Amino acid sequence: MSIQLPPPIALYVQLENAGDTETLSACFAPNAIVRDEGQTYEGLAAITAWKAETKKKYHHTVTPLDVAQQHGKTVLTATLTGDFPGSPVTVNFAFVLEAGKILSLEIHA
């Protein structure tokens, strides 16, 4: 069974798995916020730097398992596989979308 992801999330997963950290910023609104590993990244420059750093450090890929609407967010449950202890892990990506872009993303294991 194939999972139907909203276009900005589908593009995020595609670019994430391709390691295209520069183009990945095109998925986000200019004022987007990302929360990951206890840190907050605000704006496209910070998000691009965060993604480049995490990709270099973990060499990870995302495999979607499920998607659901919860409390106004689109929550993608996925397997995250990479060079980190405990890999693979199941992770929730909680997206808020606006005007075809990612306005916020919170990542929780």
Q: Positions of the model-derived regions?
A:
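Structural motif
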Residues: 28, 70, 98-99
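Surface-exposed, charged secondary-structure patches
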Residues: 51-92
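Hydrophobic/anchoring residues in structured secondary elements
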Residues: 34, 67-69, 107
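Short beta-strand edge/turn micro-motifs at domain boundaries
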Residues: 90-109
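Hydrophobic pocket/interface hotspot
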Residues: 12, 23-24, 32, 43, ...
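Short, well-ordered alpha-helical segments enriched in acidic and aromatic residues
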Residues: 8, 18-31, 35
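A short gly/proline-enriched turn/hairpin at secondary-structure junctions
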Residues: 33-42, 57
